């Protein structure tokens, strides 16, 4: 549903009050008729501005000169294989010259994510869905800026939780394969950050506790980052922080 549409100078499309809903597959055959019609909110966007080139669309190519979301709630539901991303975004702005609808490839030139709080739930932390996954999208991001953004990652079974805050960060040459759950970053410069790492089923102990880490005042530079199939690999070139134990 859309509340209001307007033309933004010079030839951009402004849209307000956008809501995207999706039926809940697991409730379609429920004996409760009220539950059968229940829907998940995939996106609730206060305002968005769109500037897309027209001619490439005829060849299934999308050239986005500007895509700007303001005050957005998101929930990917079952769109991403064995994962769910949900939360609030203050502002998401991007330029993407090279979206191939046929090959399911996306090239993002520049992107900014600010004032966001997002949760990423992996594997069996996501309720099972009977719909086969058909999301084979691959996304390349040349330059991604993060400001005042909070991420929480829940590992399978919620055994491990990692929270990261990006006060000011710049990532270059990022690559995402949404079907494989593969996430790579070529270079990361992270300032004004913090990280909390918790093994949820291990009791905390006093002093240095490697099962419950809390790193503050973080600055980090990494030449590569890799995450796939619960495996994390990073090449850190420079890092400084303060741990809650005093380290």
Predicted feature locations:
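Conserved N-terminal beta-sheet scaffold of ABC transporter nucleotide-binding domains
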Residues: 17, 148, 166
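Terminal hydrophobic membrane-targeting helix
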Residues: 1-108, 115, 141, 171-183, ...
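Solvent-exposed beta-strand/coil patches in large extracellular/periplasmic or lumenal scaffold regions
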Residues: 130-159, 216-240, 244
